[in-house]
Amino acid sequence: MVGLTVSPEISLVDEPVKIQAWGLPPDQVITLGAWLKDEKGHIFHSRAFYKTDMEGKVDLEKTPATGGDFQGVCPMGLFWALKPKIQFKQLIKHDVVGSPFLVHLELYSSFEFNPREDSPAATKVIERWYAAPGVKRILIREGRVRGALFLPPGEGPFPGVVDMFGAVGGLLEYRSSLLASRGFASLALAYFAYDDLPIFLGEVDLKYFEEAAQFLCDHPKVSSDGVGVVAICKGAEIALIMASYLPQVTATVCINGTNAVNCMSLVYGDLIVKAIPYKMERLLSTDFLSYSATNLIDDPRKPENQYSIIPLEKARGPILFLVGNKDQHYNSLFFAREAKSRAEKYGKKDVYVQCYPEAGHLLEPSGSPFCPVSKGPFFPVPLTWGGEFLPHCKAQETCWKELQEFLRRNIRCARQNKL
């Protein structure tokens, strides 16, 4: 009898899964495939070819893939390699609490190039969740603040985190729900193209983000000693601004961001910091039928751009830059090094740069599929994010752990709650 063993069959997306095939002839080429449908019905799929051992088994923790979407020993490769059938789609979970992704794992007892066209010898359907049992989601419409607050089970107080994404707009909750599953009170913060917020981001109104940080500090289940900020891309730029100007922010994680105000000017009361304009004429076509925006952002070292550099030396707490050195959207390693250099110049010693070789722009939570290119709602062409498959996915595993460890070390959390 041919079979598949998968453990665990119900898990969070950032948890590893063990996959074994058994009951096959020895030294036989087989095909393992995975697929799922997202909430809009789009299919994402992956496959790899293996050769069974002398006992007719394949163990993804030991057996190397001979080909397919990846090669070598890669226990999570079928999850990491999930790619869209419709070009330029990105796998994003929106209903993070109510339902999991159902991942269909299929075993074919021979080489199958188009595995879904034939009946598999064995199948398993597993659940991949974005929120642990007991995590609570609260939709936030408090003053001007719009978002979703995720609370771990228990009384707290919990370390608070403001969580933001980039220029995709809307409200993305999947990182916050996972952070809450790991013990953080995380506010997934929208800042444009959501609810009654502006459709387009015309300027960065720091008062809005200050209100969000204070809301989180004031929540009875969140420590009032300060909050962390986690953000990527344009959101990371805003996170660095928040760290530099807002006393509520005590720890900041910038994922592939910049070190200056770009495209949209910063407004904070009477303070106005003009942005460095994007150089749209520098968009570069790539082999992926998409465009690289690496050179869109002008050099902040130019004399005319000096006033736009973010004064991170004023930040109350430590700052961690997580960067992929194959980022094809931002020159993020350069920006991180410039930020660290400025901090050291002014005597701030708690700015850290963690660079991941061969990783691209979209450093997502562990277990997320590799997304080298996608099309967003606010850019007219598909964009290349960069990175190499295996190093990028391994970097996601590492940086997801480092991000949490950094936040736990640096967000002070009182022992008694405020209820």
What residue ranges belong to the model's regions?
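Serine-hydrolase catalytic core
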Residues: 289-362, 395-402, 407-419
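N-terminal cap/lid segment of alpha/beta-hydrolase-fold proteins
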Residues: 2-12, 17-28, 36, 40-54, ...
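Ser/Thr-rich low-complexity repeats and stalk/linker segments
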Residues: 32-87
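Post-His helix in hydrolase/transferase enzymes
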Residues: 364-382, 392-399
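Short glycine-rich catalytic loops that host catalytic nucleophiles or stabilize transition states
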Residues: 141, 353-359, 384-387
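Primarily recognizes the serine-hydrolase "nucleophile elbow" in alpha/beta-hydrolase
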Residues: 170-174, 182, 210-282, 291-308, ...
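Short beta-strand-to-loop junctions in surface cap/lid or active-site-entrance loops
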Residues: 22-25, 139, 146-159, 166-167, ...
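Cap/lid segment of the alpha/beta-hydrolase catalytic domain
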Residues: 144-145, 155-218, 265-267, 371-386
